[in-house]
Amino acid sequence: QASYRCRMAYNGKTYQDVISLIDKTDNYQADVDSTAGDVFKNGIGSTFLICRLWQNGKEVDALKSTTYSVSAPTAPSAGAFYYKAAANSHTTTLMRYSGSAWTDVSSSAEYGHTKKYTWYRRDKNGEPLDNGAAFATGKVISINGDDVDVKTVFVCEVE
C-alpha cells in the first residue's frame, strides 16, 4: 500500500487530500474449518482446526492430507501424509511415509507448507487470551474443551 498527498489549485483556491493505492492482485482469504463442529458441551469435546487459504478463488498451500490422528495410519502407501497430534501440544506435525517409515516433514522445503500459520485466542468479550501470545502454530491445530471457556474465538494469522 502506498499513500500520496495530492494538491490542486482551482480558481485561486488550493485543495489537498491523500490518496491510497492498494495492490489487490495478491489478496488472500483465510477460512477456518473444524473437523468436529464448533460447540463443546460442558467442556467436553475435541476438534482439529484447519486454516485454508485462498487466492483468486483457488486454494493456496493446500492440505497434504485429511487424516488427523495421534497414531499413524496403518498400511499407508509411499508418499502418504497425515497430521500427527500430540497429547501435550496443540500444534500438529506433518508426517510423510517414505515407504518404510513415517518422517516429520513439517519444516521440509519440499513437503512442508509454504506459509506460516500462527493461532491466537480471544475470550467471550473479544479480549486476547494467553497474554496476547500465540496459542499454537501450524496449518492444522488440535483443541479440546479445556481450551474453551464459555466462548473462545480462534484467529489464524498467515504470513
Which stretches of residues belong to each language-model region?
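Surface-exposed receptor/substrate recognition regions of extracellular proteins
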Residues: 1-159
